[in-house]
Amino acid sequence: MKKISLILLMMAMMVAFIGCNRTPVETPVPPVQTENPQPLEGTDTVVDPAPDGEITRVTLYFANNEYIVTGDARAEKVLPLERDITVGEKSVEEMILLELQNSPQDDDLSTNLENIKVLSVDTAEGVAYVNVAGERLSGGSLEETLVIYQIVYSLTELDDIEAVQFLVDGSKRETLMGHMSIEEPLKREDFSL
């Protein structure tokens, strides 16, 4: 009986962590301009059969659902997933952030960036400056931690990026969602998985 109560308590906590302060936001999908586009089977997504740009393999980091569900400090907060992206009009940094907003297509992983609006990404002297809109920034400490980890770990996989400086509406802030300091550029070494 105690095990069942513990499991129900953990599930309730998980729902509270994930569901608190989340407002569903519909994100408009830009039209894809191609000749004879074909939707992927089982989806509404249209894929350009001959994308412009160079295909690059990148390592993205997504939230570990085991960590979210159990809260076990021994579990890694984010896990790597390799993905091919097309770099053309947008930089590799911008494409990484766009990919982080998409579902990882893996039951063990999830993303916490689906509601975050990225305004710009610029890189200078080994620092990626990620500018996000303040209007969609809400969540508890777990959500904020996972958003920061996903972005910092994914961008610092690139050879020329050592740290990430977060900006909110173009300005430095103390925190992203009220819990973790983002006043200085964050390095991968600043965190422990």
Feature locations, PLM:
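Bimodal "functional hotspot" detector
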Residues: 2-193
